[in-house]
Amino acid sequence: MERCPSLGVTLYALVVVLGLRAAPAGGQHYLHIRPAPSDNLPLVDLIEHPDPIFDPKEKDLNETLLRSLLGGHYDPGFMATSPPEDRPGGGGGPAGGAEDLAELDQLLRQRPSGAMPSEIKGLEFSEGLAQGKKQRLSKKLRRKLQMWLWSQTFCPVLYAWNDLGSRFWPRYVKVGSCFSKRSCSVPEGMVCKPSKSVHLTVLRWRCQRRGGQRCGWIPIQYPIISECKCSC
C-alpha cells in the first residue's frame, strides 16, 4: 500500500527544493431517515422519500411557531427561512463554470489566520553552505518563506448555502466544504479534506404510519464541516 508522506516529510522536501534553487431502493424506511450526529467524514447527503404526501402543508409552516420550537438553536449566521441573497443562482444551482469561479473567489479571499503551525514556524531555511556552516536567512525573508508555505498548505472551509427542502426548517443552511481542486502539499500529492464537523439543530418534518399517518416537527442534529486539513 502506498503511504502518504507526513507533513514533516513534505516540509523537508520543500526545504531541499528551496535550498537547491537558492544554491547555485424504496420503502417505508424512508419515513424514519434523518441526519444523525456523527464524526464520520465526509458527510453524506440526505435521502428523502419523493412522495409529496409526506411534505408539510402550508398550515404546518407557521414561522412564529417553528421559531418558538427551535428556540435558542436558531443561528441567523448559518440558517435562513428564504433564499439568501448571496446564494449562487438564487433558487436553482449555478452553472458549473460560475460555481467554480465563485468557489475560487471565496478561496482567494481567505488567508491563513490564527497561530502558524509549529511545523512551519520551526523551519530553518538555509541559503547554502559556506565553509561548512549554514547561514541563516534574514528574519524578514524567513518570514516571507514561512507565510508562502503556510498559504500553500492552508485548507480553509468554504461555505455555501444549501437548500434542504420543505421538510426541514429553517430550509436553508450554510454548509462547509474543502477546496480539493489543487494539491496542498509540496511536492504535490496531498489535498484538503474534512477533518472536523459541528452540528446545527434544525427541525425536520417526520411522518409515521403507526395507527394512521401522523406527522410533526422534531429537532434533529444536522452536521456541517467545520475544519479542513491537508492529508492523503
Curated annotation (Swiss-Prot):
Gene null: resulting phenotype: Defects in Nog are the cause of a recessive lethal phenotype at birth. Multiple defects include a failure of neural tube closure, broad club-shaped limbs, loss of caudal vertebrae, a shortened body axis, and retention of a small vestigial tail.
An individual GO BP term: BMP signaling pathway
Gene Ontology MF annotations: cytokine binding; protein homodimerization activity
Pfam families, per database record: Noggin (PF05806)
Cellular compartments annotated: Secreted
GO cellular component: extracellular region; extracellular space; presynapse
Disulfide bonds: 155-192, 178-228, 184-230, 207-215
Subunit annotation: Homodimer. Interacts with GDF5; inhibits chondrocyte differentiation.
Entry protein name: Noggin
Provenance organism: Mus musculus
Phylogenetic placement of the source organism: Eukaryota, Metazoa, Chordata, Craniata, Vertebrata
